Amino acid sequence: MNQTAVTTEIHAADVQLAQARISATIAPTPLQYCPRLSHLTGAEIYLKREHLQDVRSYKIRGAVNAISQLSDAQRAAGIVAASAGNHAQGVAFACRSMGIPGRIYVPAATPKQKRDRIKVHGGNMVELVVTGANFDEASAAAHDYAEETGATIIEPFAARDTIVGQGTVAAEILSQLSAMGKSPDTIVVPVGGGGLISGILSYLADMSPRTAVVGVEPAGAPSLNAALKAEKPVTLDAVDPFVDGAAVKRIGDINYQIIEKNLGRLHPLVVSEGAVCTEMIELYQNEGIIAEPAGALSVTALSELKLGTDDIVVCIISGGNNDLLRYAEVVERSLVHRGLKHYFLVNFPQEPGQLRSFLSDILGPDDDITLFEYLKRNNRETGTALIGLQLGRASDFDGLVERMNASRIDCRHLKPGTPEYEFVVS
């Protein structure tokens, strides 16, 4: 049974009812002033720390709001959901706390940490099914199951009750700032399928229409930007699954309808995955915040915004379900993004002393070899090595290339995003 709503009309009163409905289960999250980001931007930056929810994501709001309104018959028939991980945890939490059987579909790219947490939150009330290469394929499987069994689908973003539940984030932000005698000039929101941003836009339209909303997407999954250009939801050919909490091929239809009504206050923005990784590291090292990639989208956008010195800006840290095993890739992507990590295919003449020459004549004093793979071949004049270099400063790159060009050793830079780079390095 599909739960998609007939109307896109959502008002502050709907969100306030949802807030009362979920208050027994979900406690408000902190709104915390961030000195570092305030100093960097010149504005007054606050972090809405949704990663501190029981399931480490705001997604629990929409899930609990939707499930708590099911009829006895719907509860008995069970529920089904598809998710990249965070919505699934919210659904699992609600299933266990309300005693409702559930079946949850997640794509194969879902980090193990998120899968394990789904099992913890759902206990024996939830069955986890891993299927499909991305969210859209997992969602198709969930819809097929619902058609076969009569289970109710709890949509992760494209349903009215889910959107209304996510809108309670905005209600809390306004209330918390009001208690300080302040109101937000801008709220920066991560965007995947559009559930959070459409809920926030709906609430602000009634309660704070002057507040601007920045919608931030990863460059590898810009479904909202594609929809805005086409003036309707479109399906992307492919998405980069790295920012898994926002890796959605198509913005929700109902979500886009709400967004379209609020274009006057919306500022869409796309940021690179490398920039997201850099901010994930900054949040951890400075604020002690473990954010997942989607959770760092909002803060990553700050460097792209023109903010006034008196502006009050809220960034939503949407989730903190990050597998520590991913941090090696996070650091790698950040170094490449900042121009500190480079890869080269180097053809060494197969003569004694060539590696020594590379080290002494080409590398700078602060350059470090992080990868060296070489296979010596007989009856060949040259042998190829894959070399990874970490520079002391990004500005050292031009000098490195000049020394390579002046050398008799043939060096070819592998540029991120090219097929050669993806094949050899990734």
Q: What is each PLM-predicted segment?
A:
Residues 1-426:
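PLP-dependent amino-acid enzyme catalytic core
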